[in-house]
Each structure stands twice: as C-alpha cells, then as structure tokens.
Amino acid sequence: INRAREHAVYSAIESLGISETVHYFDPVTGIKIASYLTDAHVCDSGNWEEVTKCIAALREFHSSKLHVAHSFDLWERLDFYESLWKGEPSIYADYDKTKRAVLSLKRFIDEQPKSIQLCHIDAVPDNFLFVHDTNGAEQIKLIDWEYAGMQDPHLDVAMFIIYAMYDREEAEKLIDLYFIDGCDKLTRMKVHCYIAVSGLVWSNWCEFKRHCGVEFGAYAQRQYDYARE
C-alpha cells in the first residue's frame, strides 16, 4: 500500500464528507487518527434496500469527478500479485487458460468509452458503513481508500458485485441499480469484463496470501470462478 497516495486521496475527498473524519494522517508511515463511528454497521449485500442506498452513495461520489495524480492499473496489479508467488504455480490447473481468456478482454475494454476519475476500487459492501448523525439522520460512510486512484467508475460497480459474490441475476440487478437511466449493451458487457478481470486480480492476491499461510476459502474460489466463467 502506498500511503502517500492514500493521503492524497483523503485530501481530495475531504470536502465531500463521504469518509470517516480524519484528524491526522502520516503519508510516510500510514498512521491515521480518525473519529470513531459509533453504532455503525456494514452494508448487508443480501438486503437490497441497503444495497440500493449504498449504490446511490457510490454514484453520488462518482458524480464529483475528482482527480488525483495516480491511477489504479488493473492489468499491472494482475501481474504484480502473480509475481508475488515467487515462481510457484497456481493451485488452479487451468490458470494459464483462464489468464489468457481474461487478457483477451483488454482490447474490448480499452475500446469502450470511459470517464477516468477518482474511483474507490475497493467499493465493497463491507466498506459502506451505515451511521447516524447527531440529529439521528441516517448517513452512509465509505471507508478504506488505500486502493483508490484514477480509473473507470464502472470498475467500482464490478468490485461491489464480486465481493458480494453475487450470481448472474444479482449482478444484473446491481448494474441496473447503478445505471438509473438504463445501461446499454456495450457498457453492460464492459462491466462483466471488469468482473472477470477483477476476479482474477483478487484470486491472484488470495493465492499470494495463501503462500503466506492465510486462507480465504470460498471467497478465493469464487473470485477465480468469476474469471473462469
């Protein structure tokens, strides 16, 4: 994690009030002091009323079209996490085939129109917190901005889907929630491509963590399945 970049992101979003209130952030060590959010709960990905509110908050954040000096390169991360295996083979017998299929999506993704802007990248249900202000009004806070950078905001939609481990029907429902004015065929295809690529990115990350003795079980398998299927 590049803490200087994370610090830049918190500076960029400060005026939005969408994150926790940060009082101190050391861009070298990453030490952060923030106000504690009391009586908070994370988004329940199976509760579509909560999901709808979170996606609306994500869409509102995207509407700000903020910029920072760094980007999140999906393809670079794919190779980087694989490089952390130190030459060890994947636990998946068809990994090479799956990776080739995922890489073949790059041309299509690159050809699609995009509005490159600050994206959260880790916009998953667990990072949306439901809290209440001093008057008791419900608020949604989006936390954990360490991966945030310049990207296509539609990638954030894909990230929510794969962390929630949605099936195809649920994924389509989530896409429709985000695109309130309708989603054209090519954009929908692009989101599904992001689902596949992101699935392999986080699968590779899970394989690295496995080498470190940390197992992610069903989550790791599901990420690979998004890439493969």
Where do the PLM segments sit?
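ATP-binding pocket architecture of kinase catalytic cores
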Residues: 1-75, 85, 89-97
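An alpha-helical support segment within catalytic cores of ATP-dependent transferases
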Residues: 66-121, 125, 131-133, 176
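Pre-DFG segment of protein kinase catalytic domains
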Residues: 118, 141-144
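Short strand-connecting beta-turns/loops that link adjacent beta-strands
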Residues: 27-29, 133-137
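Amphipathic, Lys/Arg-enriched alpha-helical patches that create a basic surface
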Residues: 221-229
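Active-site activation/catalytic loop segments of kinase-like enzymes and analogous catalytic loops
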Residues: 154-183, 196-214, 226
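Start-of-helix signal in alpha-solenoid helical-repeat scaffolds, especially tetratricopeptide repeats
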Residues: 3, 189, 193-197
